[in-house]
């Protein structure tokens, strides 16, 4: 393994239709990835892909906070639990799940309920918490400090500033295993806050991701993103941290193996 994409959506269009072509590129560059679900349907697809390509992919199963209103809590819990218990060896994380107050706060109660349900599932099956957190980092800090997860926590698509990074890092002081997954946003010229935050995040806590098909890094910004584009994100991380590319690649792969593989 030369590269790792901690969070992609090969289980969603337009990537799903062409996933075999993308996986050929995985082999060319030494890439492996987590294919992450956002609802029950594409979580099952993620598992199917991981089963078909166990040398390249692991699955994440979960319900995105912006979709919680579409599901019955108990039914979703039963479906996810069956999925995990049946296919545990192909699954690396629960998620993406979390909190998102960016578009609406109409579903805060449901987000809280689905958060706790998926949190408990990750703890029960000893899986990584793949967290989606948008416009609510103070809340996630309080919740994690109270719940004290024993399993590692990954802040997916981390794109916040230095103060937020430093505060979340203090969770390690109370025994939490937190990691930061850096998206292609870090390659954007206007991502100064994230670039500054990267300087305070220890290399041993870093992961790289694409969140493809979204958030394509420079030089593909504005186009469809693909997991193999993670190479540009990793290069930028190395440039910002002013360390050799080989060192960053090795560190990220080491972290990925420890958490997911």
Curated annotation (Swiss-Prot):
* A Pfam family recorded for this sequence: TatD_DNase
Keyword match Kinase: no
Q: Which UniProt keywords apply?
A: Hydrolase, Metal-binding
Q: Does the keyword Hydrolase apply?
A: yes
Q: Which domain of life is it from?
A: Bacteria
The signal peptide here is: none
Q: Which GO terms describe its cellular component?
A: cytosol
- Residues bound to a divalent metal cation 2: 96, 132, 156
- Cofactor binding remark: Binds 2 divalent metal cations per subunit.
Task: Name what cofactor the protein needs.
Answer: a divalent metal cation
Q: Name one GO molecular function term.
A: DNA nuclease activity
Q: What is this protein called?
A: Uncharacterized metal-dependent hydrolase MPN_009
Q: Which organism is it from?
A: Mycoplasma pneumoniae (strain ATCC 29342 / M129 / Subtype 1)
Which taxonomic lineage does the organism of this UniProt entry have? Bacteria, Bacillati, Mycoplasmatota, Mycoplasmoidales, Mycoplasmoidaceae
